[in-house]
Amino acid sequence: MKTQAVRIHRHGGPEVMQLDEIDLPEPAAGHVRIRNTCIGVNYADIYEREGDHGGPHSAKDLPITMGHMAVGVIDAVGKDVTSHTIGARVGYIGPNSYATYTNMPAARLFSLPDAVTDDVAGGYLLRGLTAEYLLRRLYRVGPGTTALVHAAAGGMGLILGEWGRLLGARMIGTVSSEAKAEVARAHGYDAIINYSSEDFIARTLQETDGKGADVIYDGVGKMAFLKSLDCVRPRGMVVSYGTASGNVGEFDLQRLHSKSIIVTRPTLRSWIADPDEAAAASKALFDVLSGGKIQTPLGARFPLAQAAEAHRQLESRSVTAPIVLIP
């Protein structure tokens, strides 16, 4: 059958993406075909579009169908698939999602509860699973924990603030403007630092009685990473989970020595590779989403053909909620 897909034939800016009609084979054994209903737009997509193949973003042959996650309805099943049936609502973390239809291994699907809408799942599945392992497994936050989150008003920042507060942690967020500060305050943050007008190192130390944060979640990268080392507590952890401002360059490992700082550069792929862990992570996420325990604001909705504009908006850093594409 034919499917429409947003592809790149060369790496570059948003303008390199184009809507193509391509052939999609019938689902192979163990696979299903999904009619995508809502597609998440994430920074991983920008890294792929630009050709940044560091870390988990391995190089692919061109042309590339864009995208790393979506939700939809199973349209066809391949041989030996017994876990899912036609008509079931599912989400997935996987390639080629900027398309009207996608084939995926049945073993990598997440069944969506009725209480979680397609838009919420599309906006929060990847971000939510990332937040789950960052807050509940990589570093277990809870009462007595002080966490600092960079880009607190962004899509990841909002769910980290909400879920961190739910777990009992004290949440400090950094933002670039007073408008974003207001957004972050409404989503679980106990203190907000506007780094455009104040020194976030000094302010973090002030907020923590000079001790530093227990854990710092950095999705910014180049602009924030080294400064984060100066405001984490001794034996604390700096988690570099994203590089929105550019990759972190080489740095002297001795900078970690005086405070025994732990630095990690994790990827979601490693934390949901085990099926049992993936199932437990999705259950935890869907419990907080469907139970109304956290707010789930949504940003702009773009038609699939306007994927380039969605990328421009995400890269503008003006976004304070997840962006999705609607096929």
Describe each region flagged by the PLM.
Residues D23-V41, H53-N96:
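Glycine-rich beta-strand-centered segment in the early N-terminal region that forms part
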Residues Y124-S197:
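Mid-domain Rossmann-like dinucleotide-binding core that forms the NAD(H)/NADP(H) cofactor-binding site
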Residues V175, M223-K293, I326-P327:
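Glycine-rich phosphate-binding loop and adjacent beta-alpha segment
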Residues P63, H68-M69, A76, R89-A153:
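NAD(P)H dinucleotide-binding glycine-rich loop of Rossmann-like/cofactor-binding domains
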Residues F200-G210:
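Short amphipathic alpha-helix with an adjacent loop that forms part of the alpha/beta core around
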Residues M1, P275-P327:
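C-terminal hydrophobic helical "lid"/dimerization subdomain
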Residues R89, T146, R170, G236-M237, ...:
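Short glycine-centered segments of the SAM/dcSAM-binding site in methyltransferase folds
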